Amino acid sequence: MKRMNKLLALLLAVIMVASFAACGNEPAPTPDPEPTPDPTPAITYPLTVTDMAGCEVTLEKEPERIVSGYYISSSACIALGLSDKMVGIEDKSAKRPIYKLAAPALIDLPNVGSAKAFDLEACVNANPDLVILPMKQKDTAQTLSEMGIATLLVLPESHEQLMEMFTLIGTTTNSMEKATALIEYYNAKLTAVAELTKDLTDEQKPVVYIGSTSDILRTAPKEMYQASLITTAGGKNAGDVLEGTSWTDIDNETFLTMNPDVIVIPTDNFAVSSPDYTAEDVLNNATFADVTAVKNGAVYQMPVGFEAWDSPVPSGILGTLWMLHTLHPELYTAEQFAADADEFYSTFYGFHVALDQAA
């Protein structure tokens, strides 16, 4: 627990830094020529794409007014350089640190409601030529389509589906150059993680239980994105015995039977505070006293301050890397994680971060 207390004491100090090229008196040596990358295919309109619900969506011209009713697609739009085209955004946007840091103008956009309660009137009044919604808003998407408003449905519940979402939005909005860069970054990091964990035996892969933000007795089934974070990082998801694509309630007996080696507590969905319970609450719960993770003090809380890294947002790759360090610190250090976090945010969101370990 001391190791992770140190990691969880990371001082998340955000530093807005302009990058300047270094100059010198001596001419720089001529580097070897780099291979010329394949050019990104040109997007032409009218354009027809197939969204993640299998529906064909046609756009007569490049979208200039985008509404995102889902924080996951909103974060993706920022990473793809589309924030200036957004004219409507999901509820409670002011609570999301990433918007304040990377695209503060989004906070003042019209509120179009949430994934659970979408405000159709507010969306239509924003006069969008493209709307992006979560899969659970199928009926709303149908209504908007019947009104002549192009609407994409997305469902990023795995690394592969997240890449599919980047490609879908990138293609539809003519931002494939940035989408390709993001996908290549993801794939490079996932390849590196696979290389680091390839020699782990089954016995070296801990059983990991991830709780929800509202209750320790809610966890992620095998089809949820959170499960993929665990397995990719060299662990075994305790919730793989459950079916479904949403947080699932269990009872004490099931939790005790799972007997995880590690327990992970995510930040809240706005990444501004801890969930409704803490690691200490779990460690001090007498009912859980015989659980391996509790006996060994292996109950860890994800960092707070930017985004919920256990969610399928672009920065979800940092959730995988954080999980890798948590489960296998001998393979991937806190210093490596800090460097990767800074690289990610500076590359795709335009600001630097410093994650300095407190003493």
Residue ranges and their predicted role:
Residues 1-11:
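Bacterial N-terminal signal peptides that target proteins for export
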Residues 19-33:
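Bacterial lipoprotein signal-peptidase II cleavage site
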Residues 68-126, 130-136:
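A short, structured surface patch at a secondary-structure boundary
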Residues 112-115, 120-133, 149, 251-268:
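Proline-aspartate-enriched helix->loop->beta-strand connector
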